[in-house]
């Protein structure tokens, strides 16, 4: 074997070793049991609900999303969930936030009963075998945790247990994400209005009907964004 071949083999072995280390490190849980980190892309997932419907990460694209891992036997979860319902879900559900509870390894009838007991109205999904949980945290770690995803699917905030200070910080993060998302939507709307304005200038009067529907749709969208903006302003007073 010549020197060039030996050098090539050494590089291949080194790259393989680095790859193994990278994979092992990425699956090593932190002190809270997480195997994902803020800034990571969310693992892909498909969630099944007791009513037979499904949702996936792709379906949530463009939305701010909060995943709440829970179980009926978890006392801390039962303590936290009414706060999620009152302080997060009811405040932001019509302003662009999705909240999904993910119940660890329990059947549909137990989950439905659990939701009624803790009086939450946000949806609870099934997680048989804790397979969804294991995408985000070590399977053997504690269940009570929340994960906030930005509109781009990146992980923005992670919580563990129910600590008021951390919970309040999560609310501020969610609010900020929704404010930023609303600003992006308003900027996009303004750009569309500008395009329509330019189109009208170059359209003969008898063809302007084609832009009227676009104007009507934009007007409705603008009203909806203004409504969300007012609700966000009111919500900010409570942070």
Describe the residue ranges of each PLM region.
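Sec-dependent N-terminal signal peptides
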Residues: 13-23
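N-terminal "domain-start" segment that seeds a small globular fold
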Residues: 27-57
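Non-globular targeting/processing and membrane-anchoring segments
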Residues: 28, 38, 42, 177-239
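Alpha/beta-hydrolase fold active-site loops
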Residues: 64-65, 144
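Hydrophobic beta-strand anchors of alpha/beta hydrolase catalytic cores
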Residues: 66-67, 99
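Conserved redox-active cysteine motifs that mediate thiol-disulfide chemistry
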Residues: 69-86
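Conserved segment of the thioredoxin-like fold in thiol-based oxidoreductases
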Residues: 89-130
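Thiol/disulfide oxidoreductase modules built on the thioredoxin-like
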Residues: 118-121, 127-173
């Amino acid at each position: 074997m010549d020197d060039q071949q030996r050098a090539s083999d050494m590089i291949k072995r080194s790259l393989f070793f680095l790859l193994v280390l990278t994979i092992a490190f990425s699956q090593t849980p932190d002190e809270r049991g997480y195997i994902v980190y803020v800034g990571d892309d969310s693992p892909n997932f498909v969630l099944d609900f007791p009513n037979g419907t499904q949702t996936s990460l792709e379906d949530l694209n463009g939305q701010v999303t909060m995943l709440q891992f829970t179980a009926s036997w978890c006392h801390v979860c039962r303590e936290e969930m009414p706060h999620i319902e009152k302080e997060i879900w009811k405040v932001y559900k019509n302003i662009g936030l999705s909240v999904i509870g993910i119940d660890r390894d329990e059947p549909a009838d137990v989950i439905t009963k659990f939701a009624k007991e803790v009086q939450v109205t946000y949806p609870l999904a099934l997680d048989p075998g804790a397979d969804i949980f294991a995408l985000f945290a070590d399977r053997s770690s504690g269940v009570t945790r929340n994960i906030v995803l930005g509109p781009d699917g990146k992980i923005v905030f992670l919580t563990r247990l129910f600590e008021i200070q951390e919970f309040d910080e999560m609310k501020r993060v969610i609010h900020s994400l929704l404010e930023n998302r609303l600003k992006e939507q308003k900027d996009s709307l303004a750009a569309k209005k500008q395009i329509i304005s330019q189109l009208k200038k170059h359209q003969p009067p008898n063809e302007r009907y084609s832009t009227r529907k676009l104007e009507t749709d934009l007007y409705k969208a603008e009203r909806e964004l203004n409504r969300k903006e007012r609700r966000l302003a009111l919500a900010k007073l409570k942070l």
